[in-house]
């Protein structure tokens, strides 16, 4: 079934002037698209999702996969996960079913977490930062939070961190792992 969700949306991404009230019919119609442009959110099962810019490629190339899978944009992918996934594994399964087409002429990655404490970072990459200049060749890579006792994380620290940088090992070839 479909989950009840809370999400946040930046209306500027829909072309609205956030310094003015929504009065015109055109602006009101644009607001109807807001549920399909979330930047983060949580659902009633405890699944939370967030989307973060990654600026991949020499001139920031958007992910633009073109296989036989159905197409989704970055924010509608997040909406789909919030509406239909109850946990991290279900969110990853949803992401694997679709070709991603990033919006706003940039690239993104996602963090998903669920009520059990499991989390994952979903990234679409192709090679290294020096070679990742063709968004159509990117593939989904999933990095799960390491909950093992041999994790480099402190014993009582069960967090996973995301920034605006790709975390896929070896992506930034000039940087040490």
Q: Can you say where each PLM-predicted feature lies in the sequence?
A:
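Short, well-structured alpha-helical segments that form the helix of a local strand-helix-strand
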Residues: 88-99
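Short arginine-rich
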Residues: 100-107
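C-terminal, well-structured catalytic/ligand-binding subdomain of enzymes
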Residues: 1-41, 45-47, 51-83, 89, ...
């Amino acid at each position: 079934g479909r989950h009840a969700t809370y999400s946040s949306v930046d209306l500027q991404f829909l072309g609205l002037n956030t310094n003015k009230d929504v009065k015109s019919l055109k602006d009101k119609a644009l607001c109807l698209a807001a549920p399909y442009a979330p930047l983060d959110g949580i659902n009633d099962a405890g699944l939370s999702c967030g989307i973060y810019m990654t600026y991949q490629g020499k001139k920031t190339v958007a992910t633009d996969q073109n296989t036989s899978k159905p197409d989704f944009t970055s924010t509608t992918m997040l909406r789909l996960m919030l509406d239909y996934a109850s946990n991290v594994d279900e969110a990853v399964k949803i992401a694997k079913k679709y070709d991603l087409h990033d919006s706003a002429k940039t690239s993104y990655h996602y963090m998903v977490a669920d009520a059990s404490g499991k989390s994952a970072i979903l990234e679409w990459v192709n090679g290294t930062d020096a070679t990742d200049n063709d968004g159509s060749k990117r593939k989904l890579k999933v990095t799960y939070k390491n909950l093992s006792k041999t994790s480099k994380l402190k014993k009582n620290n069960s967090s996973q961190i995301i920034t605006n940088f790709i975390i896929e090992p070896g992506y930034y070839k000039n940087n040490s792992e």
